[in-house]
A protein has these predicted regions:
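Non-catalytic interaction-recognition regions
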Residues: 1-262
Length: 262
């Protein structure tokens, strides 16, 4: 390791060297930095940063064999497909079920990991992964698809929003509690991104998105668009379109593929 870091410095002269390695290796990097100090390379020692992460437990079978990634994904697909078929609200063709199930399986694995502190250890499980009203990947995907559906049902109003060069001047948002909470949360997206980058903690963004999805659910229930006066409907749709934009970009940022239909 000592020879390797010296060689890297010779080749790249980087500003820093970041090692994303299991937290059990913390002592290893402490010793590496000490060795560099001993050979009077404190400058290089200061460049080394160990970013530890916790281990995922519960991936061993009853026979003691660690499950392969494709086995975990396949198991998630089976559970997701069963959930989709039993759901009374999800309306997709049979031909779409397998692709949707694969998406939900992958989304669950990603969110299950990234919603926790990077350094924490946890037991992996699909328990509650496909339960409604939980802080899980299903929540993100369902709320995104619902916002897409809302935009499609109000296509003419969406065209007006797209054509309006300066909608914030022409429209006034209602200042009700649901609107205030959702707007305030949307305003905090940049802060969540910066904090996640600064602390190297993906959970900052993931938790933000789960909170956003919950706020969207509450807002949709109380801020109707269909059947409302034109200006009110337009302002509400603008709010939901902004929420979908942030939700979509945030989901893609953590590695999810947002579903447009569920």
């Amino acid at each position: 390791e000592l020879a390797s870091i010296l060689r890297r410095e010779e080749l790249y002269a980087a500003d820093s060297y970041v090692f994303v390695v299991d937290r059990a290796q913390s002592r290893h990097f402490e010793l590496l930095k000490n060795l560099l100090s001993i050979i009077e390379r404190d400058d290089l020692s200061a460049k080394i940063h160990h970013i530890p992460f916790g281990r995922v437990k519960g991936l061993s079978t009853r026979k003691g064999r660690t499950e392969a990634v494709d086995e975990i994904i396949d198991r998630g697909c089976e559970l997701a497909a069963d959930f989709v078929r039993r759901s009374k609200t999800i309306k997709i063709d049979e031909s779409q079920i397998q692709d949707t199930a694969l998406n939900l399986s992958l989304s669950t694995i990603i969110v299950n990991d990234l919603k926790r502190s990077r350094n924490s250890e946890y037991i992996f499980s699909f328990n509650d992964a496909f339960h409604l009203n939980q802080s899980n990947a299903l929540l993100l995907q369902m709320k995104h698809s619902r916002l897409v559906s809302l935009e499609k049902r109000n296509e003419e109003l969406m065209h007006e929003l797209d054509a309006e060069k300066d909608p914030e001047v022409a429209l006034e948002l209602e200042l009700g509690e649901e609107t205030r909470r959702l707007v305030a949360h949307l305003w905090q997206f940049d802060e969540a991104l910066f904090s996640s980058w600064q602390k190297m903690e993906p959970c900052r963004v993931t938790v933000y998105l789960l909170q956003l999805a919950n706020l969207v659910g509450s807002a949709i229930a109380s801020l109707r668009v269909m059947g409302e006066p034109h200006d009110r409907a337009l302002s509400r749709l603008l709010l939901f379109a902004a929420a979908r934009g942030v939700l979509k970009e945030g989901m893609k940022l953590i590695g999810l593929e947002p579903l447009d239909q569920m």
